[in-house]
C-alpha cells in the first residue's frame, strides 16, 4: 500500500497545473454530442465506474453503500476512493464495500467514468475536480460546490467550454420533499414572510456558514425561485439567526438551531405562522441520487450553473455579515 497523500500536498500539486477561463452565463444544458463527455444513454449494458475524492465525510461511505451494497443503480459501482488520510479511506472502503484505495486522486484518471468530490470543506473541491473536468469526466460535487463564487464561475465556464457535465446541490434541497413544499407555498395567497430552522455552526472549522449553510440556503433558492439581494446575520456565539431579502419582496428569517438536526419551514398567513410539511413519502432512489446518476449516464445537468453560483454568493454574503455585523449585498 502506497502512502496516502496529505490534503495539503494534493491541493498544492493540483493547483500548480490548474488553468481557468472566465465567463458568466448559464442555462439548463444537455450534452447530447459533446466532444469529450461520452454518453451511456444508448448503451444500457455499459457499466459505469465511479471514483470518489474525499473520505472524511460520512457521505462517501453512504455513496459506497448506495451503489455497491444496496445496488440501487445496477451497472454503477464505486471502484476507487481517495482519502485525506489512510484511516479515512479505509473506513469508507470498509463501510461502502469500495474495492480500491488510491494514493493520489489522479491515479483514478483513465479508470473511472464518473467522479464524486466529497471534501468536508468546499475550498478543496474545484482544484481536486479540475484534472477530471479536463478529461470530460462527469462530476458531482457535494455541497458546498465551492468556497468562492469567482472561482466557481471560472470552473463552470471551463466546464461549458469543454462540454463536461457538472452539477452540485444539497441533498436536503434537491429532494422530492423540497419540491413538494415549493408547490404548496406557490399556491398560498400570502408568502411574504418565511421562517426556516436548521442546524448551522458559524464557527465550523469546515468553512463556517459554508458547511451546513447549503442545507438552509439552497432550499430557499428552489422554493422562492428568485434572487436574494441582501443578508444580515445576528451572531450569538457560534449560533444565531439571519435575515435574507429577495428581489420579489419576500423576507426570510433563518434560525440556526443547535439542538435539533432537522429542518422546518414556516410561512406567515392571516392565522399566524404555519409550518409547511412535505406531503410526499420518502422514495428510493432519492431525487438527489437519481438526478446525479442520470447526469452520469446522459450528461443532462439537473441544475443551472447560475443557480449553483447564486447559492455560493448568498453564503459569501452571510460570511461577510458574520464579520461586519451589518447588512451585506449578495453579489449578482
Describe the predicted segments one by one.
Residues 94-156:
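Beta-loop-alpha module in the N-terminal Rossmann-like domain of NAD(P)-dependent dehydrogenases
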Amino acid at each position: 500500500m502506497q502512502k496516502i497523500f496529505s490534503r495539503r500536498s494534493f491541493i498544492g500539486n493540483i493547483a500548480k497545473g490548474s488553468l481557468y477561463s472566465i465567463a458568466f452565463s448559464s442555462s439548463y444544458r444537455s450534452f447530447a454530442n459533446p466532444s469529450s463527455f461520452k454518453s451511456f444513454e444508448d448503451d444500457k449494458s455499459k457499466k459505469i465506474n465511479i471514483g470518489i475524492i474525499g473520505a472524511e465525510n460520512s457521505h462517501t461511505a453512504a455513496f459506497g453503500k448506495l451503489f455497491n451494497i444496496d445496488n440501487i443503480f445496477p451497472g454503477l459501482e464505486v471502484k476507487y476512493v481517495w482519502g485525506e488520510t489512510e484511516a479515512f479511506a479505509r473506513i469508507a472502503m470498509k463501510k461502502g464495500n469500495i474495492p480500491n484505495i488510491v494514493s493520489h486522486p489522479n491515479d483514478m484518471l483513465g479508470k473511472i467514468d464518473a467522479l464524486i468530490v466529497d471534501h468536508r470543506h468546499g475550498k478543496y473541491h474545484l482544484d481536486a475536480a479540475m484534472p477530471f473536468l479536463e478529461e470530460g469526466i462527469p462530476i458531482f460535487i457535494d455541497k458546498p460546490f465551492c468556497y468562492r463564487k469567482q472561482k466557481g464561475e471560472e470552473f463552470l465556464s471551463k466546464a461549458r467550454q469543454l462540454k463536461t457535465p457538472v452539477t452540485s446541490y444539497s441533498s436536503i434541497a434537491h429532494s422530492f420533499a423540497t419540491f413538494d413544499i415549493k408547490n404548496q407555498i406557490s399556491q398560498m395567497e400570502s408568502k411574504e414572510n418565511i421562517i426556516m430552522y436548521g442546524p448551522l455552526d458559524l464557527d465550523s472549522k469546515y468553512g463556517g456558514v459554508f458547511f451546513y449553510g447549503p442545507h438552509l440556503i439552497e432550499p430557499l433558492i428552489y422554493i422562492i425561485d428568485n434572487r436574494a439581494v441582501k443578508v444580515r446575520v445576528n451572531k450569538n456565539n457560534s449560533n444565531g439567526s439571519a435575515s435574507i431579502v429577495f428581489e420579489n419582496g419576500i423576507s426570510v428569517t433563518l434560525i440556526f438551531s443547535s439542538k435539533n438536526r432537522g429542518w422546518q419551514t414556516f410561512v406567515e398567513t392571516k392565522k399566524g405562522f404555519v409550518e409547511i410539511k412535505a406531503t410526499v413519502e420518502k422514495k428510493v432512489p432519492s431525487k438527489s441520487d437519481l438526478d446525479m446518476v442520470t447526469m452520469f449516464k446522459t450528461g443532462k445537468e439537473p441544475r443551472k450553473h447560475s443557480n449553483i453560483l447564486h447559492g455560493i454568493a448568498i453564503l459569501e454574503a452571510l460570511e461577510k455579515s458574520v464579520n461586519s455585523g451589518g447588512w451585506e449585498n449578495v453579489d449578482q
